[in-house]
């Protein structure tokens, strides 16, 4: 069975590069009816935090990238790592090393001064050293000294590294803790991982890991090293480019559907298709069409996709996110129009859900502050007379008539005729009175969504406060 994994370290936030790796791994497993494993690589005890673990889990949940089975934590597998280390020592494939930090520093200085390759010189490799109680030691892996390590990378093609370039790496530190390159191999073997999709910053780790697979007589998985994501300027993606906690995109009003759709096309292609549902991603995804070159993060493209999903999604699919943003700014959605109807009207005017909530606030909050520029521009000496006539005409409408935007628009038009002014002399002051600014959807639709009671109350307030 095809089995992939996403194995983040909880030493920082989950950013878009990590999300894309997780997405590619998840899609490949789903495309092949396989399994997707989530493993938290928390062996760095000093830097790993529960806060970072929670952020990773929250991000994966928000995006809908559900793992199969339990979530694995490396810190709960230390006994297993120690067991395998002892097996390697017993088989002569690893050894105890007593070299002090001072000796290793002197060795490195000597190598650098003489333009030699830096790395461990193998002093303890064949010394058959057995540590005595109280002595400080590490355990090193016996890397092959001859030949090359080669693999056919699913993205980068054939890669070969001479074993002469690799030294005997430490697999157990002096404090007894196992090291990253060793742990991941044991994990991937035990979890039957068949395909490892990860960032190309791991390419240099791969030959070391392959040698450990071989030493443990295990099958070597397929590696697919995905190029990094660059900022719009071609520099390494940083916080100013968007390398922030993926949950910040939620706070900024982006839909998970838009994030996933954007990231799947960032370095992978399927003809000219730009819009993908989750089902379409799963059906189309493969490793062959991952681009070997880095991709640039394009905020405008992400914003365009987000607008598309706000406009085109079924309301049920985005309702939770919409309600989240309305609640975030303190809006009571029970005190206004049906949210589904509102989104259908406002979607064309916004790029994010933050904009949607902010630009729709007057529909739900009666605590509105008039825009001074709009008041100055549209409220004139004659406006009071117009408001009086509007109130008179609106009061005459019954509940059924108020549900028809065309009827409401015609009332505004009729009022303009009655007051012998142009439509703009009525519509714009009316907008200011009922929305606090000069901007809103079509006036008939705005009136319908606000409802008769709100419109009458706000017109009355405007008449008292703006038309003195």
Swiss-Prot record:
Binding-site residues, ATP = 239
User: Which GO terms are recorded in the biological process aspect for this UniProt protein?
Assistant: glutamyl-tRNA aminoacylation
**Binding positions for Zn(2+)?**
97, 99, 124, 126
Q: Which InterPro entries match?
A: aa-tRNA-synth_I_cd-bd, aa-tRNA-synth_I_codon-bd_sub2, aa-tRNA-synth_I_CS, aa_tRNA-synth_I_cd-bd_sf, Glu-tRNA-ligase_bac/mito, Glu/Gln-tRNA-synth, Glu/Gln-tRNA-synth_Ib_cat-dom, GluQ/Sye
GO cellular component terms, semicolon-separated: cytosol
Might you give the EC number(s) for this enzyme?
6.1.1.17
The record's cofactor note says:
Binds 1 zinc ion per subunit.
Q: What's the top EC group for this one?
A: ligase
The answer to whether UniProt assigns keyword Repeat to this entry is no
In Pfam terms, one family for this protein is: Anticodon_2
Q: Where in this protein would one find the motif 'KMSKS' region, according to its record? A: 236-240
Kindly state the subunit structure of this protein: Monomer.
Q: Return the protein name.
A: Glutamate--tRNA ligase
